[in-house]
């Protein structure tokens, strides 16, 4: 689909709306629809995870807990809206770290990696009535498990494709949010390449 946008928006920044921004921010605004003050975890702080964070910030959610194995991602996570950062690893009890912040669990858990074990962890960390939103894409044919009784506490598992987006509606909306200073796009661009540098870009 082709969507006309304002010429004032830099193309390098605008190009990101059509993928990571729609997928991540759209998952929050269109699929999860959290109320202000809702607690959330985001597992996997890549391009999609960062946009989930800023969608949660736009929704006035909080606490917003970012989780990743790379400690270098903490600064970006907090720039995009995380109130807390947990560096996951073999020596860290991630579930315990989350419960130190939200003792009863969280209202929303966004899995942005695509790993069955992390999907299970998201479900286990939900509070009563919480929702797990699946964004990461696991290996084809993968299966994930959960304790059936846990879902009787009004928990939900929500699949989400492309941020449940309507491009002709959502892209102009995100452009307007960007122009109003409420949506970060420029900060998502780490480097640009000319067409003849395609191999360099692939190797970067």
Place the predicted regions along the sequence by residue:
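Short, surface-exposed connector motifs at secondary-structure boundaries
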Residues: 36, 57-61, 78-81, 100-106, ...
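Short loop/turn segments at beta->alpha junctions
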Residues: 90, 114, 194-197
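N-terminal Rossmann-like NAD(P) cofactor-binding module of classical short-chain dehydrogenase/reductase
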Residues: 109-110
């Amino acid at each position: 689909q082709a969507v006309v946008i304002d010429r004032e928006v830099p193309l390098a920044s605008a190009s990101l709306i059509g993928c990571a921004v729609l997928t991540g921010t759209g998952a929050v605004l269109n699929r999860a629809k959290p109320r202000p003050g809702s607690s959330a975890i985001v597992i996997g702080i890549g391009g999609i995870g960062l946009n989930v964070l800023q969608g949660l910030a736009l929704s006035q959610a909080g606490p917003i807990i970012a989780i990743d194995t790379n400690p270098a991602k903490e600064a970006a996570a907090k720039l995009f809206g995380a109130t807390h950062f947990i560096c996951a690893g073999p020596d860290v009890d991630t579930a315990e770290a989350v419960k130190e912040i939200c003792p009863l669990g969280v209202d929303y858990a966004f899995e942005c990696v695509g790993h069955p074990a992390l999907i299970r962890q998201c479900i286990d960390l939900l509070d009563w009535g919480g929702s797990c939103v699946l964004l990461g894409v696991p290996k084809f044919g993968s299966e994930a498990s959960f304790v059936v009784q846990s879902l009787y506490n009004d928990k939900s598992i929500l699949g989400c494709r492309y941020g449940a987006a309507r491009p002709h509606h959502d892209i102009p909306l995100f452009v307007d949010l960007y122009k109003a200073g409420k949506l970060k796009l420029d900060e998502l661009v780490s480097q640009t390449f000319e067409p003849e540098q395609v191999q360099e870009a692939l190797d970067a």
